[in-house]
């Protein structure tokens, strides 16, 4: 399996509860390396651009408001099959349906406040990474 990079966000519900270290430990335990990481406060424009794919969905406004409600941690993760591996580590969007031991089963508050985001495909990962990181910020 090829070494890949994927994009991750530790959302405001995670930073608010000071559980970013616990989430990072689960990421690293899964064999993924954190090759870039920074704590930011997303602007409304950043959140709307990032979640533009959901613009016509009824939850779009609430999602954007949530993502700008507090600091987030944006990350680039690297490892073999990183995209699929991180999606497995995150667990199902609905924490009640997430597998035991996953980030969302352990830490998510609800479907909306589900602690983490991860890219769903290689092309998406490239786009998402470029929205928040320049090349010299990614140190593998």
From Swiss-Prot:
Enzyme class: transferase
Binding site for ATP: 11, 59, 87, 93, 104, 114
GO cellular component annotations of the record: cytoplasm
Subcellular location: Cytoplasm
Xref: Pfam families: NDK
Cross-referenced SUPFAM superfamilies: Nucleoside diphosphate kinase, NDK (SSF54919)
Swiss-Prot/TrEMBL keywords: ATP-binding, Cytoplasm, Kinase, Magnesium, Metal-binding, Nucleotide metabolism, Nucleotide-binding, Phosphoprotein, Transferase
GO MF term list: ATP binding; metal ion binding; nucleoside diphosphate kinase activity
Catalytic activities: a 2'-deoxyribonucleoside 5'-diphosphate + ATP = a 2'-deoxyribonucleoside 5'-triphosphate + ADP; a ribonucleoside 5'-diphosphate + ATP = a ribonucleoside 5'-triphosphate + ADP
Annotated GO biological process: CTP biosynthetic process; GTP biosynthetic process; UTP biosynthetic process
NCBIfam families: PRK00668.1
Cited function: Major role in the synthesis of nucleoside triphosphates other than ATP. The ATP gamma phosphate is transferred to the NDP beta phosphate via a ping-pong mechanism, using a phosphorylated active-site intermediate.
Quaternary structure note: Homotetramer.
Stated name of the protein: Nucleoside diphosphate kinase
Native organism: Rhodopseudomonas palustris (strain TIE-1)
């Amino acid at each position: 399996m090829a070494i890949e990079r994927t994009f991750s966000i530790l959302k405001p519900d995670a930073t608010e509860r000071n559980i970013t270290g616990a989430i990072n430990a689960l990421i690293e335990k899964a064999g993924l390396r954190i090759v870039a990481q920074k704590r930011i406060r997303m602007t409304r424009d950043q959140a709307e651009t990032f979640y533009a794919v959901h613009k016509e969905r009824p939850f779009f406004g609430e999602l954007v408001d949530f993502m700008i409600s507090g600091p987030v941690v944006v990350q680039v993760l690297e490892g073999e099959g990183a995209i699929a591996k991180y999606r497995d580590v995150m667990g199902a969007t609905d924490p009640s349906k997430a597998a035991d031991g996953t980030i969302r089963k352990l830490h998510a508050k609800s479907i909306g406040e589900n602690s983490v985001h991860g890219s769903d495909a290689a092309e998406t990962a490239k786009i998402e990474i470029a929205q928040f990181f320049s090349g010299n910020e990614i140190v593998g």
